[in-house]
Amino acid sequence: MEIYDINGQIIDPLAGKTLYVAGDSIAYGKGSAGGYGKCIADRYGMRLINEAVDGATLATLVPDNVNGGYRTSIGMTVKSSTELEKADYILLEGGVNDAWNNAKLGALNGSFDPAFYSGDTIGTLEAMLDDLAKKHSDKRVAYVFPHGGLFASSENWYKTYKPAILSALKKWGVPYVDIEECAPPMGAHGVSELSDKYTIDGTHPNKAGSERFYMEPIAALLKRL
């Protein structure tokens, strides 16, 4: 149902709201400053807080073989954030770097006991969702899966990581949007012509890619929350 102002203009439910984004380089906007979060914020008149980090994983203590040390954990970033109170919407994304770096996957906890093991991918994801449910239950939370073509169909993203993350989201009642379902495959296992047009390297959407494939499906989900 649309809401109108006194002049008969549609009032968008996202206008004036604050969108918090956490995730990896796709959410960070390595191919387009601010990523899809900025595209959504600009299009719908939202305020944006983007704490996504290039190269981040869900799991903790995943070695960074490029820069040394360990990769930033998305779960720990969210749990320690001082920005969440400002948010109306919390948009999460991650797991691709876990799969690429063979992070320990872990298993879905059979209960809602908060004593989760936070070192592996699923344990950290569950701990993050548990923390959001307890401390930020007034926020509207959603998850984003990226476009297809980043992995071959036989690789562990499709066999283990993505199904496990999806199961955790369903357990915690977190809605999600899967960009792979509404965009052509790009990247190493996608359509090269589209990769050249809509990404900087097959993995990271440029501004055109964020607007063409990410912005509207994510905004539509946020409006339903």
Question: Model-flagged regions — what are they?
Answer:
Residues 93-97, 129-162:
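Active-site segments of SGNH/GDSL-like serine hydrolases
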Residues 146-225:
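Catalytic His-Asp segment of secreted/periplasmic serine-dependent ester chemistry enzymes
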Residues 18-20, 26-115:
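Conserved SGNH/GDSL esterase-like catalytic core that processes O-acyl groups on lipids
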Residues 36, 77, 121-128, 161-165:
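A general structural detector for well-ordered alpha-helical segments in enzyme core domains, enriched
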Residues 1-22, 26-34, 38-47, 78, ...:
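N-terminal secretory targeting modules
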Residues 47-49, 140, 173-175:
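Conserved beta-strand segments of alpha/beta enzyme cores
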